[in-house]
Amino acid sequence: MERIKELRDLMSQSRTREILTKTTVDHMAIIKKYTSGRQEKNPALRMKWMMAMKYPITADKRIMEMIPERNEQGQTLWSKTNDAGSDRVMVSPLAVTWWNRNGPTTSTVHYPKVYKTYFEKVERLKHGTFGPVHFRNQVKIRRRVDINPGHADLSAKEAQDVIMEVVFPNEVGARILTSESQLTITKEKKEELQDCKIAPLMVAYMLERELVRKTRFLPVAGGTSSVYIEVLHLTQGTCWEQMYTPGGEVKNDDVDQSLIIAARNIVRRATVSADPLASLLEMCHSTQIGGIRMVDILRQNPTEEQAVDICKAAMGLRISSSFSFGGFTFKRTSGSSVKKEEEVLTGNLQTLKIRVHEGYEEFTMVGRRATAILRKATRRLIQLIVSGRDEQSIAEAIIVAMVFSQEDCMIKAVRGDLNFVNRANQRLNPMHQLLRHFQKDAKVLFQSWGIEPIDNVMGMIGILPDMTPSTEMSLRGVRVSKMGVDEYSSTERVVVSIDRFLRVRDQRGNVLLSPEEVSETQGTEKLTITYSSSMMWEINGPESVLVNTYQWIIRNWETVKIQWSQDPTMLYNKMEFEPFQSLVPKAARGQYSGFVRTLFQQMRDVLGTFDTVQIIKLLPFAAAPPEQSRMQFSSLTVNVRGSGMRILVRGNSPVFNYNKATKRLTVLGKDAGALREDPDEGTAGVESAVLRGFLILGKEDKRYGPALSINELSNLAKGEKANVLIGQGDVVLVMKRKRDSSILTDSQTATKRIRMAIN
């Protein structure tokens, strides 16, 4: 206070003011500070005093021809004096105003194309809705977020090649445009930017914004998709938040969201198949998201989510080194441990074999709605500091940490038997057994954990076994904090391996991910996901399985027909018939299969009983392991639309309806495709069925005697040739194969050769 008073007194004297405003600064140190180096030391001040001058701007001499010396008000726009040290002209700020109003205009057609991301942002903000402001403590945690809405997902190198090709097509330098997205974007941009007058460097910079994902590590409470991050400064402060609904969506957020849904569906489906890893890869390779191959998206998209990372690991891509447990991402921040197998007894005296982590370790735990810091020793929780959005989220984090600690009191808190199974009906591993048990009900766990008195520490409070806050007592070692725990910021990726049950391990053998960690949350994808794999037919329910199965048979009828006559077992084992089995009542599967297989065998043996439509209709039923029985059926039941519906063995039904006139099949009223059969439908199938073991050599050859009927063929010796009468009175030359085993590829040509021989 004294000093301020003294200064006030000084300033009231006119001499002081004169010294401060008029005296030159001639102290060498000060002059040095402000004049050494090219870097401006006080840009704001410099700008202020420059703009106070009459001519603060320099311009090329050509400006004198383009701008009048004075404006309409008679103010001078440029000075005839040269800028010291260059041959440029000194110009007034008023010249800029004149130029903006009266200067030359250019075509603006390219602006929305080049500055696309800005124009789109304006649209999103225009149509967005801002809600009320709430004042409350904000638990923000730093997360790696996408700050650039509306981008493609090219790598920096790929984008660089595209930009060079679009903006500087004549520059020297090897550019290899390989990926589909690179080629599409290049073509599109070249067309859009023809005759563009905007500075190439600006175009290049804007293209980069459009092509590459930019991420930052920012404190966020709430939505993390890029359309929320672009308004982060408007929606959350230190003690307030403003509700906001974006006025539009962007492709990159939609891709991220749809990728997660597709990956979860695929992992869930793969888990229940005979070879999960092979199935997962088959599905990833045959799935498209928004018209782009899922494997291409996986290679480029940095989204970290359990199911997505399992798919990446299966493709041999690197993933983050953090591991997942109970839906939380764990990252070890210090300490180390060795793993030992140990047998423990639950409160129900059930023996569990668990892999115990021996040693002191510290972890950060990050989930969607809660975060925590965990310090633990061998089978002991030392400290857990947790923060979350609400009581429920905090409880979830505490349960996961307690189970992860492997403490004895947690294992003893188990009541009843642990027999949780996964989707494939296999028992879960012991740690996940415990987790599921306590996620269902953690009362006993919290009650038997123990409580302790707590010190008063700023920003921390205790939490009681019933999950209510307290300032006096808390669950042993557990505290609730107002501050969130930041997500692990590193973008480092490590090489991992994956086994056939989709367990992902790092190079030390630690399990980072397993299908148990994949969220069961269902969502609706923003982009169309097209699963071409038969394994995904059931995702849309029983009807979809039925329609897809029959569509598949019709699409592949040529091959199916030959296999049906030559190698039925191989046909019955096709994975495309797997989903169908879930529609057939369990008790009837074997009987139906036995019945249909017998029927098919009769068709193969007895001439003229071949019936294309009937084979198509009954084929899926033959895929189950058959039971030998004498049972006959006039209709077969399938479970769709919540009840059993009948497929008639002979004739049409609402489930399976074949229209002879249009040759189209409808399944449950949905079109399942058209049969492309020969005009004499049925006979071509018979020929290839009956001519099994014979090679069709061509047209009739009189040297081999008169035409035999198909029935007389059986008398030929191996290697012997004969003319044979088929179908509508046509004659072809055949030879009996020298080997008994009929080869599939030979017979695939049978039908074609009959046609060629006849024509």
UniProtKB/Swiss-Prot annotation:
Positions of the record's site feature: Avian adaptation: 627
Entry superkingdom: Viruses
Transmembrane helix is among the record's keywords: no
GO MF term (any one): RNA binding
Motif Nuclear localization signal, chain ranges: 736-739
Compartment list: Virion; Host nucleus
Assigned keywords, A-Z: Cap snatching, Eukaryotic host gene expression shutoff by virus, Eukaryotic host transcription shutoff by virus, Host gene expression shutoff by virus, Host nucleus, Host-virus interaction, Inhibition of host RNA polymerase II by virus, mRNA capping, mRNA processing, Viral transcription, Virion
GO cellular component: host cell nucleus; virion component
SUPFAM superfamilies, sorted: PB2 C-terminal domain-like (SSF160453)
A Pfam family it matches: Flu_PB2_1st
Keyword Protein biosynthesis part of the UniProt annotation: no
UniProt similarity note: Belongs to the influenza viruses PB2 family.
HAMAP family: INV_PB2
Subunit structure: Influenza RNA polymerase is composed of three subunits: PB1, PB2 and PA. Interacts (via N-terminus) with PB1 (via C-terminus). Interacts with nucleoprotein NP (via N-terminus).
Protein name: Polymerase basic protein 2
Species the sequence originates in: Influenza A virus (strain A/Grey teal/Australia/2/1979 H4N4)
